[in-house]
Amino acid sequence: MSAPVHPVPGADGGDPLRPATPGLRSPQVPIQVPAGSTAAAAVSEAGLPTHGAPDAIVVVRDADGKLRDLSWVPDVDVEVTPVPVNTDDGRSVIRHSTAHVLAQAVQDLFPQAKLGIGPPITDGFYYDFDVAEPFTPEDLKALEKRMRQIVKEGQLFSRRIYESKEQARTEWAGEPYKLELVDDESGDAEIMEVGGDELTAYDNLNARNGERIWGDLCRGPHIPTTKHIPAFKLTRSSAAYWRGNQKNASLQRIYGTAWESQEALDRHLEMITEAQRRDHRKLGIELDLFSFPDEIGSGLAIFHPKGSIVRREMEEYSRRKHIEAGYQFVNTPHITKAQLFHTSGHLDWYAEGIFPPMHLDAEHNDDGTVRKPGQDYYLKPMNCPMHTLIFSSRGRSYRELPLRLFEFGTIYRYEKSGVVHGLTRARGFTMDDSHIFCTREQLHCELASLLRFVLDLLGDYGLEDFYLELSTKDPEKFVGSEEIWEEATAALAEVAENSTLPLVPDPGGAAFYGPKISVQVRDALGRSWQMSTIQVDFNFPERFALEYTSADGTRQRPVMIHRALFGSIERFFGILTEHYAGAFPAWLAPIQVVGIPVTGEHVSYLEEVAAQLKSCGVRTEVDVSDDRMAKKIVRHTNQKVPFMLLAGDRDVRTGSVSFRFGDRTQINGVARDSAVEAIVCWIVDRENDFPTAELVKVTGGE
């Protein structure tokens, strides 16, 4: 691998800068809260930190799993589990409380601002506001300053229960978005205002006299006071539709982040800076790989020559490995009649993700009357229904199973403009899509070998830090019987558990037709990405009446396994670009070698070396520009070219070249044949490290 794929320090929830304090009970050990006493008193009695420490307790979890404020007073003796700030739940609480502080600051500085929602999100929080003008960077600085004043004041978070919805409506009559939420029953996880057993507000109180300063409709929980926010930062602002619906008002969203310590915040901000440096959208332009022209539309990429080389290498290696593993390649069209997606269920369960239909094939008489009615065609959002038609195109025998079909199939999904994100969330993309048809008896072995194949192939591209996620049935959105789902889920769970990889449950996360295993990978920054999906489906074979002849001559239904290894070519391209910061392994790099002459007199010699490399299949160029050698080196270093070969008078005279690498190391005076051999071996061996003088082994050299 070219870079470590371990999480950044502290990403596991611990703070390596804070030494362990002896004598304190583990925050994970339950404690007793006596009836009539506060949770805070019980936490203090247990000797646990409640303020100032990176593992300070901010809330507790009751026996039902519900998070409770430290001010909570139970009616009976209860056992609770303290939740420290340096855990996912703890961070979520301080981030939500910080969002309240942000909203208070906005209404202090912009009194006409109307409040939207302000949930915690991964690594941060946001709050939506209806304001006359977009927020500027100067506004964010002023808001952050006001927030620090609020934090310093130590305002108390106080929970208040409404006696009725009517009481809440009266209080929030001047806040139209909050008023809408009073009656919300959507269950949307991002709506923190409602959804609990009671309709509540949280007031910010003056710590000295208890007077209400500000408040928000909210189900909680929250930290005790604003002083319990250790470290925060506002990061950016953007436009956002109210509740993500383009038909609603456009609001202004402010994003921020909050952490358990200044050190943890600093680490996170450093990671953000590094992530911005690695952003595939930025690198795609800088390295001339791909672009998103406005003339084509949002979420639709075009790959330039260099990007197409990387993509071709990705595809060709995958194609070869699939052929070796017994897959058969197929091709299907981009559009299909509507009936296919009625049969599959996509138009019933996935209509919001499909582009509008094209009405075609209608024929009219001269007088305008319809001679032949037309029909709707759809851009395909998935390849699976078409692959079932390949299976059913003729009779099948058990001897043909498992039948492994594979396609680089371009599909189209209607993603809202607000969620489109470069190559990783596009509207048109190519899935490396496989559908395997097997018997029930073959299912377990096929799943086990498939998971191993997926992990091995991803490892060949330099990704190695994996865990699995098991997505199970959404009770509100599924087809088929409970028994079929249980059988499919059990098969996937057994294979996942036998893999020895960490397994994370994802209840309700499956598609409507079957449960799935998702292979998650951590990149060089420790960020998690969903890669491959493996989905067991008993339902499509039933819906499409798929059959094979078994050994005893009876007709049986096959089991169908859906599998996308990269997820999509485009998404995998974007992830690899960020993982390697644009410095692709030499075997993937669009330009593998560039020759840099000291002067124009050395061009012809380097062109001979380039011809020798090209004859071995190495993508080689010679820089014949009029720029000075130093400028050429900088340019090709910035373009992430793995190998630079320099040549001057001495090299021409001795038949040698000098290696120059991206880390500024160099190997001088290497015989050209030895140089060619070293480069070819490095590429053929598919080394994923970026070459350096230390790593590249050559005969001779200085």
Curated annotation (Swiss-Prot):
Residues 15-84 form the TGS domain. SUPFAM superfamilies: Class II aaRS ABD-related, Class II aaRS and biotin synthetases, ThrRS/AlaRS common domain. GO terms for cellular component: cytoplasm. It is an enzyme of class 6 (ligase). Its cofactor is Zn(2+). It catalyses: tRNA(Thr) + L-threonine + ATP = L-threonyl-tRNA(Thr) + AMP + diphosphate + H(+). Residues 279-585 are annotated as: Catalytic. Gene3D superfamilies: 3.30.54.20, Anticodon-binding domain (3.40.50.800), Bira Bifunctional Protein, Domain 2 (3.30.930.10), Threonyl-trna Synthetase, Chain A, domain 2 (3.30.980.10). One of its GO terms (molecular function) is threonine-tRNA ligase activity. Binds 1 zinc ion per subunit. Its main location: cytoplasm. Its EC number is 6.1.1.3. Keywords: Aminoacyl-tRNA synthetase, ATP-binding, Cytoplasm, Ligase, Metal-binding, Nucleotide-binding, Protein biosynthesis, RNA-binding, tRNA-binding, Zinc. Zn(2+) binds at C384, H435, H562. Homodimer. Belongs to the class-II aminoacyl-tRNA synthetase family. This is Threonine--tRNA ligase. It comes from Mycobacterium leprae (strain TN).
